[in-house]
Amino acid sequence: MDNVNKIYIDIDYDRLRKEMYDLNVDQFLIENEGQMSVQTIPGTPVDKQPLSGTLSLQVDWDSHDASDPNSKPKKRDVVLEEKDFTEVCDFLKGTYTEEVINMLTQEYKVVRGRYMMMNWKSCLTHHIDQTPRIHLPLVTNKDCFMIIDGKLVHLEQDITWLADTTLMHTALNSGRHLRFHIVFCLPPIEDGRTENQLEFDLE
């Protein structure tokens, strides 16, 4: 598997974008550190669902003092698992976005889906994920990139992408406008295969 590959699946990106704006998701992201869950753990109260799977599930970055070179974020008291975020959040019930989530769940068993916004002139930490990610770029610009295993890639808008984020990577928006993606995690492999041995409908 290359660092990024196209997934050929029929998604109406215009409808996804329209629903994002109609549901005021963009405003929620601006007010809540750029993330909003689209999948949650079954039984999560409705009012807790939108933030239930956001930010790091392992560490609390609020405990990190960036001015101290020896500071490290502490591990969360309760560490959640990506694979447990399987239920579509209530605010998306009956929407086209729910249809897309269900389609991706059927095809790829996706978990812990989130809307993710990147502010202009910003980037993420350099890190690795437990499993690859599926990206649905809703709004992007030519100055948005991922760097995966040292290679610079641009995820074009309105194309569904599989990114091998089990490699060291980051993402950056060096443009002048906000970037909006929907991002899904693939589930952990249970049969001994590595993530790179998965088969997809790729180019």
Predicted regions and their residues:
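A short secondary-structure junction signal
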Residues: 125-129, 146-150, 194-195
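Short connector loops at helix/strand junctions that flank enzyme active sites
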Residues: 108-110, 129-133, 141
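Non-heme Fe(II)/2-oxoglutarate
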Residues: 1-100
